[in-house]
């Protein structure tokens, strides 16, 4: 099979020609199983514009803010939204929710300032999350977004050890998965590396069986699993291992990345493969900043 990612703009036409020759069939064109679901990460670059602007674009069905990047044994917490004015984010969250776009918070990220080495640290993190961003109201816990109430938590656990207790955190969050009345869940998601099986600390959390969705990052330079090599086999394993969880294909909107996939290749290659699975959920985009530059979501949304 031809590689799906565009390695260089110079070879783009060649890639498209090969993809068209391989995939231009009635089955590929039908591309069943579409959901129209597109999740985007927001908060990694101040130049990406406001959260309100992202929701008003009409391109996304969920926005994940990133990251709460410090937590764990030392009892300290840090929210990094890349210099965005936090005083306006609360109103933007409510605006997004009024438009039917849920907003979640991703914890972890690419830094190394987090861990959950014990049950106690996991419960302490839950307490911080619940009182800072959800339904809690401890006077001693500041609320960065005022009385805005988020819709979910995403685990983006790039670093960790087998001792980390993200399973305890997930189970505690699941006990509080109704916000504001019946039918309003606290969405519990995870954003994982492409390769399967996952690292031990991620696998232990997912083994709880309570994650609503998982975003599989196929756009990074993982030697054994990326858009040039191996992602389809890993996709099969991920979706089979957790049949009750919805899986999202993670794509980059950065057209300068070696792992960027041309929209036509999403249509002819990525979407038909991903949508064969009964628990296909949609597409996750990294991230709003790149998408604003390239308008990638406007080109792939209707293939999702």
Curated annotation (Swiss-Prot):
GO biological process annotation, one example: defense response to fungus
Localization, UniProt: Secreted
Positions annotated with a glycan in the UniProt record: 119, 295
Record-linked CDD domains: GH18_hevamine_XipI_class_III (cd02877)
Induction field: By wounding, methyl jasmonate, and by E.graminis infection in leaves.
UniProt keywords, alphabetically: Disulfide bond, Glycoprotein, Glycosidase, Hydrolase, Plant defense, Secreted, Signal
Cellular component annotations (GO), alphabetically ordered: extracellular region
Any one GO molecular function term: enzyme inhibitor activity
PROSITE patterns for the chain: GH18_2 (PS51910)
Region feature Interaction with fungal GH10 xylanase, mapped onto this chain: 262-275
Active site residues according to the UniProt entry: 158
Region (Interaction with fungal GH11 xylanase), start-end ranges: 178-184
Disulfide bonds listed in the record: 55-96, 194-225
GH18 domain ranges (all copies): 36-304
Pfam families: Glyco_hydro_18
Secretion signal span: 1-30
Keyword Acyltransferase listed: no
UniProt xrefs under InterPro entries: Cts1-like (IPR045321), Glyco_hydro18_cat (IPR001223), Glycoside_hydrolase_SF (IPR017853), Glycosyl_Hydrlase18_Chitinase (IPR050542)
Record note on quaternary structure: Binds to fungal GH10 and GH11 xylanases. Also forms a ternary complex with barley alpha-amylase 1 (AMY1) and insoluble starch.
Annotated family: Belongs to the glycosyl hydrolase 18 family. Xylanase inhibitor subfamily.
Entry function: Fungal xylanase inhibitor. Possesses competitive inhibiting activity against fungal endo-1,4-beta-D-xylanases belonging to glycoside hydrolase family 10 (GH10) and family 11 (GH11). Possesses also inhibitory activity towards barley alpha-amylases. Binding to xylanases or amylases is necessary for inhibition activity. May function in plant defense against secreted fungal pathogen xylanases. Is similar to class III chitinases, but does not exhibit chitinase activity.
Protein name: Xylanase inhibitor protein 1
Organism the protein comes from: Triticum aestivum
């Amino acid at each position: 099979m031809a590689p799906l990612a565009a390695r260089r703009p110079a070879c783009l036409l060649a890639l498209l020609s090969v993809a068209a020759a391989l995939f231009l069939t009635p089955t590929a064109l039908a591309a069943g199983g579409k959901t129209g679901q597109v999740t985007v990460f927001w908060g990694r670059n101040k130049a990406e514009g406001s959260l309100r602007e992202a929701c008003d674009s009409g391109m996304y069905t969920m926005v994940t803010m990133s990251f709460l990047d410090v937590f764990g044994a030392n009892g300290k917490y840090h929210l990094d939204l890349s210099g965005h004015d936090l005083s306006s984010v609360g109103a933007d969250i409510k605006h997004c929710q009024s438009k039917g776009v849920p907003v979640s918070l991703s914890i972890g990220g690419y830094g190394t300032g987090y861990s959950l080495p014990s049950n106690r640290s996991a419960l302490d993190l839950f307490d911080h999350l619940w009182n800072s961003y959800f339904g809690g109201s401890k006077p001693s816990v500041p609320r960065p977004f005022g009385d805005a109430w988020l819709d979910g938590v995403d685990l983006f656990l790039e670093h960790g050890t087998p001792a980390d207790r993200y399973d305890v955190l997930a189970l505690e969050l699941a006990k509080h998965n109704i916000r504001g009345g019946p039918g309003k869940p606290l969405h519990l998601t995870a954003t994982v590396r492409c390769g399967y099986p996952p690292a031990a600390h991620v696998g232990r959390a997912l083994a709880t069986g309570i994650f609503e969705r998982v975003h599989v990052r196929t756009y990074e330079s993982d030697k054994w699993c990326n858009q040039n090599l191996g992602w389809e086999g890993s996709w099969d394993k991920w979706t089979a291992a957790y049949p009750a969880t919805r899986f999202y294909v993670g794509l980059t909107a950065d057209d300068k990345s070696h792992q960027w996939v041309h929209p036509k290749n999403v249509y002819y290659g990525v979407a038909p493969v991903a949508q064969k699975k009964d628990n296909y959920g949609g597409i996750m985009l990294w991230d709003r900043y790149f998408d604003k530059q390239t308008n990638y979501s406007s080109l792939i949304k209707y293939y999702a």
